[in-house]
């Protein structure tokens, strides 16, 4: 069972259990704990770290000041849900062995794919499965249309549309990685509440990346999911569900890199809008807008090292020591309802100073980062929260 494809099984084996108290056995227990952690689809760069928590602290990168600009929440990303349990397939982790097909299942998935023009593909298919040892079944007709187009200046446009008519009463329970705010991440059991028992569902996704002039980049992302149960509203309520559920998320980003002398000034802006009505009645409806403005300054100091031929106005010089200063301000408008981590309107600001030094030592590249961070968050009707952090990290590697 290796759903995250990292070469380590996710089951706990008897010979990894800590039966005693010596150091070797304790180390074995640590390995066993790590084997139970899995985040399929969230390590696309293959570095064995969660792409949404690269620094391994108690905050996902999409919640952390400055890092949040590069990291978008997984619920804004596109993917197919072919087992109709409400979770994108590429993010799923279960406790089942990785057989070519699920045990106790019989059936087929047949589809036809046509490339209409280069970059534009259309798929239509039929899914039919049943349980061998029971009365469960899955039947669906579905379509998928995708379009990828290159834009000028290295830009790219991606569009995807997916829809399905589903009848599915086979539960596909999961064991998923969850990263709460200010708490260690953990694996939790996620029950399939059968949102595709008898339903129509549609997904629409689009993202576009553009370069406008020298040093200016913008990015837009849109995701819309809609599901309509074909049973009555009362029947849906009896199983703690809603007849109509949806998710609408829009992300806009812009950044500008401005060379000033040897330094670089980087203004950034990010906006995140989400409107969500989950299938489960245990989770409330919510609508919110969150925006951040970031200003970063990087100033080279001290010795300079040039790894390639450098000509003025063509390329960037590399400096062994850099001073980085940044400030981020953000605001959350909770328009309707509430969701986890967003119960009230809030404002925040964060300031950081970091000194980065890079040097070579016996064939290794050693990077040292030292700095401090101040943060204040004002929550409407609940006062303010202040936090300060002093940090120092040392990283050694063979690659520059």
Where are these regions (language model features)?
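Transmembrane beta-strands of outer-membrane beta-barrel proteins
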Residues: 118-124, 153-159, 216-220, 252, ...
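Eukaryotic acidic, serine/threonine-rich low-complexity intrinsically disordered regions
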Residues: 122-204, 209-226, 234, 245-246
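Outer-membrane beta-barrel strand-turn architecture
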Residues: 114-118, 147-153, 165, 198-200, ...
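Acidic, glycine-anchored loop motifs typical of Ca2+
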Residues: 2-96
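Transmembrane beta-strands of outer-membrane beta-barrel pores
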Residues: 126-132, 161-167, 222-230, 258-260, ...
């Amino acid at each position: 069972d290796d759903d995250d494809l990292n070469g380590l099984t996710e089951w706990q084996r008897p010979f990894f259990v800590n039966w005693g108290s010596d150091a070797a056995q304790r180390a074995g227990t640590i390995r066993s704990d790590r084997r139970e952690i899995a985040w399929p689809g969230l390590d696309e760069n293959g570095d064995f770290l969660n792409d949404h928590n690269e620094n391994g602290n108690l905050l996902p990168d999409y919640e952390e000041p400055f890092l949040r600009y590069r990291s978008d929440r997984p619920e804004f990303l596109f993917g197919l849900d072919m087992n109709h349990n409400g979770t994108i397939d590429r993010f799923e982790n279960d406790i089942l062995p990785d057989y070519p097909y699920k045990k106790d299942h019989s059936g087929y998935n047949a589809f036809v794919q046509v490339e209409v023009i280069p970059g534009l593909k259309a798929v239509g298919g039929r899914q039919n499965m049943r349980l061998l040892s029971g009365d469960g079944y899955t039947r669906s007709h579905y379509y998928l249309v995708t379009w990828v187009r290159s834009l000028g200046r290295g830009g790219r446009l991606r569009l995807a549309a997916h829809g399905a008519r589903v009848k599915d009463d086979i539960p596909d329970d999961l064991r998923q990685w969850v990263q709460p705010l200010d708490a260690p991440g953990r694996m939790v059991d996620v029950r399939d509440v059968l949102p595709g028992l008898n339903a129509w569902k549609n997904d629409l996704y689009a993202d576009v990346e553009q370069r406008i002039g020298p040093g200016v980049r913008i990015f837009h992302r849109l995701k819309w999911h809609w599901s309509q149960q074909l049973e009555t509203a009362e029947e849906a309520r009896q199983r703690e569900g809603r007849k109509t559920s949806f998710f609408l998320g829009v992300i806009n980003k812009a950044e500008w890199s401005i060379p000033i002398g040897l330094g670089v000034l980087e203004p950034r802006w990010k906006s995140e809008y989400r409107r969500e009505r989950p299938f489960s009645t245990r989770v409330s409806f919510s609508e919110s807008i969150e925006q951040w403005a970031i200003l970063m300054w990087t100033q080279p100091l001290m010795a300079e090292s040039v790894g390639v031929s450098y000509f003025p106005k063509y390329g960037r010089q590399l400096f062994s020591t850099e001073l980085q200063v940044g400030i981020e301000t953000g605001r959350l408008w909770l328009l309707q309802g509430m969701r986890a981590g967003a119960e009230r309107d809030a404002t925040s600001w964060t300031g950081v100073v970091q000194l980065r030094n890079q040097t070579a030592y016996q064939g290794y590249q050693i990077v040292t980062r030292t700095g401090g961070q101040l943060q204040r968050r004002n929550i409407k009707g609940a006062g303010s929260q202040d936090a300060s952090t002093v940090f120092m990290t040392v990283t050694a590697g063979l690659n520059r």
